[in-house]
Amino acid sequence: ISSYLKLSKKYNAKIKYIFETHFHADFVSGHLTLANKTGASIVYGPNADPEFKAIIAKDNEVFEIGNITLTLIHTPGHTLESSSYLLKDEQGKDNCIFTGDTLFLGDVGIPDVAQRYMGVSKEELAGILYDSINNKIKPLSGDILVYPGHGAGSACGKNMMKETVDTLKNQKKINYSLNGSFSKDDFIKELTDDLPVPPTYFPSNVKLNQEGYKDFDIVLKKSLNPLSLNDFKSLSKNDDTVILDVRDQDVFKQGFIPGSIFIGLKGGFAPWVGSVVKDINTKILVVCEKDFEVETITRLSRVGFDNVLGYLKDGFDVWKKSNEKIDSVKSILPLNLKEIIDSDISLIDVRSKLEREKGLLKNSINIPLNDFDTNTLIKSDTYYIHCAGGYRSMIACSLLKRLGFSSLFDISGGFADIRKVNLKIN
């Protein structure tokens, strides 16, 4: 919430409302903390049932903020309470719409997130979403700007654009949900076929956003706990505790604490913590570079992981200097892989099925990282692992190492660099 508070201070402005588009599944939104610090009212659309004080607005209810207004437009489908907010300027002209997870750029919000906890089928929700987009958003002026809740990389959609704002006019041309290229039945099929597996922490985050969550100041005070080597080792022996190494992947592979999980701060950190660690109540011990302790705890808390026991004081260096056991991951350049690709080697591709449709290595095994099922793998075999750029493959290597796989090679640079050396790609 710091960005909002800084802007408010900069412009000497009062935060009057906190407009929520829905109960978010992929992060803890910070609405209660912001409300407590500013006195602002939290606003949801119809069907929302928060367990704290909030305004449950009606469809088309108007909120005045100075000389502008925001109109709540109920646009269910992603979830049943999903709403968008249409902003009108000082002249009363439609200016932009904040669509949350209803409409993305080039895509729409997938419906399966909601049906996991609302008891409604994904097909029903997809049909409701079709009606919301065509009856509520499509009739609006093409001149308005569309500000979605996510860009590319979010698990709340299938194939979003990387841009963060566009005109509705352009989206009516290129977005399949708006350009008339699909009937309602075809839209439902397109949206519900091959849905990505949502991270297991999503329902927990929905619950936190709906019921309430721990105050971050308290979480930070408890978690910012420097641990001696002996205390760190003692705590790490508990079965319900994981060691999370958040350093750069190229540093991690050269040496790390055996059994630790790599999820680097420089990548899609929070969503992958949720996908890999899964249970938000898991006790976490952190290994990080100096001065990154607060950032690590903050970003963990944003997805509901508030149970950090502390961090290794002086980082991995103190482990290394104490002559403790160290593990590592071997790497191989795509150019060197080219020399052995035709021999009998086992390749694991941890990218999504959608990514593989754009190109894949022949005979590679697909085990997407967001559903990392290793039951078919043999611990004594050698595996060569890649993703798109190297971040996810290193996460996969750390997970396999933790399970007892010893002969692993991370393919440096991932599929992006594989393409550069003219390997045979299907």
Walk through the language-model features, giving the residues of each.
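Hydrophobic "anchor" residues on beta-strands that sit immediately upstream
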Residues: 16, 97, 241, 345
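Short, well-ordered beta-to-alpha junction loops that form the rim of enzyme active sites
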Residues: 147-152, 158-159, 204-206, 245-248, ...
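Histidine-centered catalytic micro-motifs
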Residues: 18-28, 75-82, 146-154, 388-391
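Active-site HxH/HxHxD metal-binding segment of metal-dependent hydrolases
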Residues: 1-74, 93-95, 279
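Core dinuclear metal-dependent hydrolase active-site scaffold
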Residues: 62-92, 96-97, 221, 225, ...
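Metallo-beta-lactamase
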Residues: 79-197
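Active-site metal-binding loops of divalent metal-dependent hydrolases
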Residues: 1, 23, 47, 79, ...
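Rhodanese-like catalytic fold shared by cysteine-dependent sulfurtransferases
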Residues: 110-112, 123, 170-207, 211, ...
